[in-house]
């Protein structure tokens, strides 16, 4: 009887071990499944250069992009249709857009594109929406000219960082990295190298930001 029990327990542990190994193997997707995937245009037609793109946490269908010639655009159907959500509030060149992870109704947009070329257009600071792009208000850094990236704290939508390239045609003291802790009402310059060195990107450590 003891022999049967031992064999039974041995079989149980072997089954558990094999099942666990199978589950671990299933967690790693086979790279070959992506071989057939092809890029496709999702619009909008003549939307201009897309200088900033972001998704919405918890939604696989909602996205925003910052157009260098047409403001901020939004889709809620994975790119089948797009709508300009900045018309009537601001327009022209936009270089950055970010959606809060903790409150997806909060969206920040930054003016001016970061792709330096002969015919770039500057922007007029940061804009903020509290209703997922339906309405917008100014949120500071009006003289920043070219905002390259916006990053929002993962748990506090009032804490936001801006990478500012500044005026690309001349030395400019409005360059570097800026931080706001009150939703864009006030900004503090937290990194400045020189008036000829701007910031073009930002990555946040969620535990130290």
Residue ranges and their predicted role:
Residues 1-6:
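N-terminal secretory signal peptides that target proteins for export/translocation
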Residues 21-25:
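Sec/Tat signal peptide C-region and signal peptidase I cleavage site
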Residues 26-209:
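Beta-propeller blade termini and top-face loops
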């Amino acid at each position: 009887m003891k022999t049967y029990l031992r064999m039974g327990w041995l079989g149980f542990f072997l089954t558990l071990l094999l099942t666990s190994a199978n589950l671990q193997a299933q967690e790693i997707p086979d790279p070959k499944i992506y071989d057939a995937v092809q890029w496709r245009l999702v619009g909008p037609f003549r939307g201009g250069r897309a200088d900033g793109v972001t998704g919405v946490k918890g939604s696989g269908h909602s996205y925003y992009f910052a157009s260098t010639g047409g403001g901020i655009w939004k889709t809620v159907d994975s790119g089948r249709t797009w709508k300009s959500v900045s018309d009537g509030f601001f327009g022209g060149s936009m270089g950055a857009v970010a959606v809060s992870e903790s409150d997806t109704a909060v969206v920040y947009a930054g003016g001016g594109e970061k792709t330096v070329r002969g015919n770039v257009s500057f922007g007029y600071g940061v804009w903020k929406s509290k209703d997922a792009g339906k309405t917008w208000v100014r949120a500071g850094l009006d003289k920043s000219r070219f905002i390259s990236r916006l990053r929002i704290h993962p748990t506090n939508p009032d804490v936001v960082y801006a990478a500012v390239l500044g005026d690309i045609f001349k030395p400019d003291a409005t360059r570097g990295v800026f931080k706001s802790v009150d939703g864009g009402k006030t900004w503090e310059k937290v990194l400045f190298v020189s008036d000829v060195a701007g910031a073009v990107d930002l990555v946040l450590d969620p535990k130290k930001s």
